[in-house]
Amino acid sequence: MILIPRGEAIFGTGPDDPYFEESSTDREKPQFRADIPEFYMGIYCVTNDQYFKFVKETGHRPPDQATMETPVWKNGKFPAEKAKHPVVCVSWHDAKAYCDWAGLSLPTELQWEKAARGFDGRIYPWGNKWDENKCRNYKNRGLETTCAVDSYPEGASIFGMFNMSGNVWEWCDDWYESNAYEKHARNDPTLPNTGQFKLVRGGSWHGDSPLPFRCAAHIPINPDDRVYWTGFRCVRCVGGR
């Protein structure tokens, strides 16, 4: 894991973003600055190999069933060549169970966004210009879907996290609220502790537009969904979970 240091960072979408006028980015506004406590974040998403150890030790259900698409795992196992690929077809509840087992947590939205874009508010983890060759996406995947979690080092974030854009969407801890960024901007701590949707971030191999790969982008999905383009990574607070 890598330490993400304390310090004021930029969150949300501002006028310099090429998608600022898109209605789908309204939930990413306003842009604001905030200082959140330091924390550790996984360099990579959790892999099939890591998740297998969790399933074997705890008896948790394997990700061999999917809400959409065909799962990678079959009969509790995954293809050997997928060992270092991110585990997919995991619900938010599955991801949370893994984190609990590992003594870790899912990142909050603000933790995730700060780790992806650094202190300077860059639009993508590598800078402000879209480059389809710096992350796994629909246009460069060929006949493949996911890739190994250490792929595309040239697209790593300023802190050194891989695949914060592309490969798989990543679960965050937060419940979705359409005006959450308005609350963050005025330092209002009353975010929901229940709801209908959780949030994922980062875009995936399934996307062909730059819009979802931006660091500020997020979409609400059902926490029970298990789909072929969603995985997760873990965080740890300094001094504990």
Question: What does each model-found stretch correspond to?
Answer:
Residues 1-64, 92-93, 120, 127, ...:
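Short, compositionally biased
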Residues 10-24, 61, 66-219, 223, ...:
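Functional-site microenvironments in short loops/helix caps that host divalent-cation chemistry
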